[in-house]
Regions:
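Cleavable N-terminal signal peptides
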Residues: 11-12, 22, 68
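Extracytoplasmic small-molecule ligand-binding "clamshell" domains
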Residues: 29-105
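Acidic, polar ligand-binding/catalytic clefts
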Residues: 66, 78-145
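Bacterial N-terminal signal peptides that target proteins for export
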Residues: 1-13
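Short, well-ordered beta-strand segments
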Residues: 38-40, 133, 149-152
Length: 152
């Protein structure tokens, strides 16, 4: 079942990359002409995107992006497709995609309305929720217990 989910996930991502986004056409044309796929990555967003001890980009999100690259290469019937890595920061990752300096950003970027106005997102591959922690001897047991208190 996991294999079926993974195939569905990858095919969905490839569909988004190849079809849904009008801006993908110049990228696909460049790749067809022998150009490189530029994958943006983070330096230390463990476990999603980080540099290993050899300064090689690795991580869960990188693995997914490399699977997307394989699928795009297959879809375009390319014998080889060069891949370049571009290290980005939280401050420049969206601008690098907007400027066309990177084709995919493989990290832990949160999908929100403001960012969706600038770039397209795939289906989520990680979902999290906010948690609150207090000392075990605190009198705070519910969210309502924090009303009127100063929070940092």
């Amino acid at each position: 079942m996991l294999n079926r989910f993974f195939r569905f996930f990858i095919s969905s991502l490839v569909s988004l990359f190849c079809v849904a986004n009008v801006f993908a056409e110049p990228v696909l044309q460049r790749l067809s002409n022998g150009g490189s796929l530029v994958i943006a990555h983070r330096e230390s967003s463990i476990p999603f995107s980080y540099l290993d001890s050899n300064k090689k980009p690795v991580g869960y999100a990188l693995d997914l992006c490399l699977k997307i690259a394989e699928a795009v290469q297959k879809k375009l019937a390319l014998k080889k497709m060069p891949i370049e890595f571009l290290q980005v920061t939280p401050a420049n990752r969206i601008p690098m995609i907007e400027a066309g300096k990177a084709d995919l950003e493989c990290g832990s970027t949160t999908n929100n309305a403001e960012r969706r106005e600038k770039v397209a997102f795939t289906i989520p591959h990680f979902i999290t929720g906010a948690r609150l922690l207090v000392l075990s001897n605190s009198k705070i047991e519910r969210i309502e217990d924090m009303f009127g208190k100063t929070l940092v």
